[in-house]
Amino acid sequence: MKKLITLILAAALTLAACASAPDTASTPLANSTPEPTAATTPAPTTAPFYPVANSYNNGDTYYAFVHRGEDSLLLKTDYAAATQTVNCAVPGCAHDSDACPAYFTDGPGRNLVITDDPLRVCHVEDSGCPVQIYTVDPAEGKAMQEINGVGNCDIAYCDGTALYGIDKTVLPSEATPACRIDLASGQLDRFTMLPSELMLGCYDDGLLTVHYVTDAPLPKNGEEYAAAVQSATLEFDCWDPRTGTRTKLAERLYNSTDARFSGYDGTANDKLYFVDYLPQNDGTDIKLSLTVVDPAMGTEEKMWDTWPDEHFGLSIGQRILPVHGDQSTRWLGMCYSNSGTNREIPYFMDLETGEIKEVTQKREGLSYDRRVTVLAQANDGRWLIETAADEQRSCLGMALITPEQLLAGSTDWQEITMWQG
């Protein structure tokens, strides 16, 4: 049983929380199934992909934004020095205008940290708005490149030289438009994926995708589509948009409860995890079995027949690991979350021993019970954790601690000297 619980938590924990989609003009499709096209601009094929977010962890440094009303500052946490500073080395800078390398307006949209050498920030807004890419020099300032014509681009992945995304607004019967933005030149390339194909996350040196497999092209008409898709299967692939290389990883039957993902719940250590659901009359679903698919071994195994509690779900996945390097993990997390009781309790499982342990240390500064949370993992294996926050969930305290110490209930961590702004 303990082994089963371990695998379950593993499954639950590593959700590749990423999926994205850029929009740009796509080629009109015929009724036949079109072949996907690779991005036309040459790109390195050895660099792995990683999801982009408003924070960035390279194993030595953690970059994240702090919001200050209508603007944000990019902060840098150095693990070796255990200090957090503004990412600005301009003498006498007040960090209150665009002249500051760390200053970014909030406005609409999101600021994403996308590379660290050189340091780049991408600002994305609603569909139709230009994408802005900033190259940041802490001592000199920042240079901005504006990319027009991206359309409904939802940027979500990077390989260090280019950004990638897809347009999820098109019908599943149509080929999925995708785009690539070269970070050096700013060149925008458009290409297509298979009809209904979506990006789910990263896998090996490619992207994890899913698409419907049907005997005939899916119709566009709503009722005809709903009838035709019932007999579809969902194929999960590792796909490299730079070369067009595609490797099938898993196949699942269509499931009306989770029509686009057929219960896909995450990826951990190159294994795919799927949850089966049982629909209820009140419109809710009950979690049933947990299945793990190991593409390398060609095996599919049911690891769990009944979930221990409906309130358990995914928590921390691959995003805590350094962007570059080995993406395997010993520690997998799960969270008990019950909005009815306002309870949120993180757990971690040691895959080597099968032990499941609760994180008991509480975050300071909150009027309600919230435990410390893991933000990132350093190259030396320690975890960067948030130890204090305000009622708006702004981070007020951080520390470094080994996983073993944290899960033993210790508060003997190395505190980060926080920037006082």
Identify the residue ranges that each predicted region occupies.
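Bacterial signal peptide processing site
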Residues: 19-22
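Repeated scaffold domains used in trafficking and secretory/extracellular systems
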Residues: 48-58, 95-114, 150-160, 193-205, ...
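An edge-strand/N-cap motif at the start of beta-rich repeat modules
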Residues: 27-85, 89
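Surface-exposed loop/turn elements that mediate protein-protein interactions on large endomembrane-trafficking
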Residues: 42-48, 72-98, 128-149, 171-193, ...
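C-terminal motif of bacterial Sec signal peptides marking the signal peptidase cleavage site
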Residues: 15-17
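Sec-dependent signal peptide recognition
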Residues: 2-10
